Amino acid sequence: MPIDKIFKDDASEEKGERARMASFVGAMAISDLVKSTLGPKGMDKILQSTGRGHAVTVTNDGATILKSLHIDNPAAKVLVDISKVQDDEVGDGTTSVVVLAGELLREAEKLVASKIHPMTIIAGYRMASECARNALLKRVIDNKDNAEKFRSDLLKIAMTTLCSKILSQDKEHFAEMAVDAVFRLKGSTNLEAIQIIKKPGGSLKDSFLDEGFILDKKIGIGQPKRIENANILVANTAMDTDKVKIYGARVRVDSMTKVAEIEGAEKEKMKDKVKKIIGHGINCFVNRQLIYNFPEELFADAGILAIEHADFEGIERLGLVTGGEIASTFDNPESVKLGHCKLIEEIMIGEDKLIHFSGCEMGQACSIVLRGASHHVLDEAERSLHDALCVLSQTVNDTRVLLGGGWPEMVMAKEVDELARKTAGKKSHAIEAFSRALVAIPTTIADNAGLDSAELVAQLRAEHHTEGCNAGIDVITGAVGDMEERGIYEAFKVKQAVLLSATEASEMILRVDEIITCAPRRREDRM
């Protein structure tokens, strides 16, 4: 009985060589798509949404580009997933991981065409991956015992991460900001305490780091503009009185006096609620929902700063940094945890008024205010800065660093080549192929900078045959240079994640020998 008779209508399958080719082609297409964004001279892509408003994103972040694509090919989806995981785990290397996985599959395609079994290729790739990782471990730099040198390493890593982004022109300024912000976290990798606020206007150079928390709200009329030693109640509760109008209920009354009585009763109810809130011993009340005029007047009379309609992310972060909890009921003041800070005041950034909380309970809190020409510039600046913050927070925990500019790939390729010479059998072809795939990263960096990649990579290979060589590609001068002298550093954790994720993804795709596309379940099938 033919296999296709087992499947329902609309289901399809591809077997053997066709399935493998479909997987390879899809993965290589995704790799080629993001390849041009790699390196300091990588180009940006414009992503235009087909939805309402046709939103436009301008970016060169691999993960952002791939997340925005609607992909049909299953192997391509695997590469999109590894890029997302790389972004979540370490923040940088999202393009490198896809390019390396694509190159490994390109090499594997040639080996399969030479009648080498996929399992032999996988075994060779595993050996090569382990050898490459060990080569990096031998050459890591670790300055965790020297605070000054370690800070310098972090600055260099931040500048390397930012040099391929929109912030490259002011990378020193933003690297300083990112390192200062990460040091305030005191070893934590929770970036929630670092708030990024985007305000159009000015230039990227006008961006600054502020110690404390900034809430994008104005202080109401008649409210105190400055409060010292603040006790803050963060809440998510309805502060409106006119329930009858809101819920569309109807009340029949025989005189206007009765209407006045209903309104009076609602006002009394609101007075009681405000009294309970004031009874917590607070001088600042921040609410997720609207605060109507009447309760706002009551708070102003009591000398309490009332902030309404704070966005949910804003109040969650405010609760976190001030040490408070979000409350919804106010009958038991002793069970409500209040937030504390030394000073609340109104500040101006550009044309906008914002509320600044300084001296917060959580000392790690800080805000980065980004200025820029447009929302597109600010969105890309935020993504770039977030990548740098992720890499730095990971490096504070795993303090090992490496040189950059294609140096790690050449070190790994040299060791893997030596392993290939010592290995007998067909596996040695797979190990050699792994080495060629590694060299594709410095080749792409040089190509994207408009340099002669064949010449530069040949020069690099020759340089790396001397022991302890620090040579890499310097795209600014367009020549091979000493990466230590140029101050081009990368985090070991990023490189390790790129190597292991790309190898595992290519392994997974290599194992495929059949793709079965299932038909969607029809409505009657679900009954």
From Swiss-Prot:
Write the record's keywords in alphabetical order, separated by commas. Answer: ATP-binding, Chaperone, Cytoplasm, Nucleotide-binding
Q: Does the keyword Cytoplasm apply?
A: yes
Task: State any single GO MF term.
Answer: ATP hydrolysis activity
Q: Does the keyword Chaperone apply?
A: yes
What organism does the record attribute this protein to? Arabidopsis thaliana (Mouse-ear cress)
What function does this protein fulfil? Molecular chaperone; assists the folding of proteins upon ATP hydrolysis. Known to play a role, in vitro, in the folding of actin and tubulin.
Q: Name one GO cellular component term.
A: plant-type cell wall
Name the PROSITE patterns for this protein: TCP1_1 (PS00750), TCP1_2 (PS00751), TCP1_3 (PS00995)
> What quaternary structure, including any partners, is listed in this protein's UniProt entry?
Heterooligomeric complex of about 850 to 900 kDa that forms two stacked rings, 12 to 16 nm in diameter.
Where does it mainly reside?
A: cytoplasm
Identify the coding gene: CCT2
What InterPro entries is this protein classified in?
Chap_CCT_beta, Chaperone_TCP-1, Chaperonin_TCP-1_CS, Cpn60/GroEL/TCP-1, GroEL-like_apical_dom_sf, GROEL-like_equatorial_sf, TCP-1-like_intermed_sf, TCP-1_chaperonin
Where in or outside the cell? Cytoplasm
Q: What is this protein called?
A: T-complex protein 1 subunit beta
Classification via Pfam families: Cpn60_TCP1
Homology family: Belongs to the TCP-1 chaperonin family.
Q: Which SUPFAM superfamilies match?
A: GroEL apical domain-like, GroEL equatorial domain-like, GroEL-intermediate domain like
